Amino acid sequence: MSQQELLKKIIQALDQAEIPYMLTGSIVSSLQGEPRSTHDIDVLIAMQKTKAHILLEAFAPSEFYWDKESILEAVDRRGMFNLIDLKEGGKIDFWLLTDDPFDRSRFSRRYKEKLLGLEMQVSSPEDTILVKLRWAKLSGGSEKQFTDALRVYEVQRGKLDMEYLELWATTLAVAPLWRKLLNEAEIA
């Protein structure tokens, strides 16, 4: 199954199970910034334990690897679980929505984007930038994550809520990376 087919399958399964979601990560930064290849799909979901079986029904064990116990545990601890396409190796990382103020804020700011003939809920460009900066910091300065954030900023410049970005860059302790991004964008 191609990544596009996998993405369609995920969105249809989430919509059918009525699980609120938001696409995030490199697939969204490629949409909002500069396209780059990525092997996984990141999805933030607001799923209750009772919905897990409905979601899993869409992913046959003969085609996808998943562990029901790990999934239920991830729902309990508001962590993450993944599904792996056994044929193509595509990976879907499902991140459970937490009570973290930034998680709640970015989830409330998601918007609909038409892609592959489907309407999908995606992260706002501001939140994509902030998450990429946070991952850059957590990974010890990942240039790939920083560059993704920079490219989203460059493409979306003039349409971004700069006050929101400043507030959360400070709150998330990524203000130095945010300033570096602004400096590099000015030079370009």
Predicted regions located by residue number:
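Compositionally biased terminal segments of proteins
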Residues: 1-188
